[in-house]
Amino acid sequence: PGPSAEDLEAPDDPGEDLLGLLTDPAWVYRQYDHQVLNNTLVAPGAGDAAVMRIKGTTKGIALTVDVNPLACYLDPYVGGALAVIEAARNISCVGATPLAITDCLNFGNPERPEVAYQLTEAIRGMADACRELELPVISGNVSLYNESQDTAIYPTPTVGMVGLIDNVDHKIGSGFVGEGDQIFLVGTESLESDVTSLGGSTYLSAIHGKINGGPRLDFALEKKVQKFIRDASSKGLISSAHDVSEGGLIVAIAESCVIGDIGAALNEDLSEIGSLDACLFAEAPARIVVSVSKTLSNEFESLALNSQI
């Protein structure tokens, strides 16, 4: 079962909870040289996927690696599917079209029935997601028997994905860009307000020490939202795009502020929201935080309306 209002106290200081969820992995990935041959246009950490140009053309390739082990632990099928879906969402967020995946399946001892179940269901979820997105699996490997003291790791079906941008002039980063740009939440008509939507979230695990509930999945909505982001990017309508994933909406917004070195003013009235922590920290899928120049906001909204977003 998922969390209930009785399980969780209202956050005393959402700002402190936000700081508890923000991390800085830069000390790891910045040890590596991303500029070999001077082809990197969006470095790791600057966008939801890295982007490299293809010299002599207008095209570029986008690369990302994704998985949420907690989601896979709670629901191996949905978690496996979401690993593919989130990778595609991240590829789309830089303006690229997903092309293919590779995978690395990391699990415990498959001789244990529960691990065999996790492995089978995660693969089934990944396969269904690949069929939905029409993506081939071009390579992969498996790492099993990952245990210590008879305790298996969380199921971790890691997905690497490559995508293509036809015109690298339309690439997008995750950071907010210009003062006065407008911020949109794409993929939903309302903010999360039900405490049960916190099920399977990083917030529930890291702040409250609870692991329950389960991740959600909507193939049709994901495909529609991702296509819209790619269309808007190709028309040059988007300044930045960052998907809502681990940590929820407020973490995605904060990360866009940090990456872009610019603040954000949010004027949404939350006084009547059912659950403030669900609004801020729920990880409902198919949501993307987008910033758009004021001069382009009407065209962006018109495209969203025509795309039934």
Please place each PLM-identified region on the residue numbering.
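Glycine/proline-enriched, intrinsically flexible loops and inter-domain linkers
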Residues: 1-309
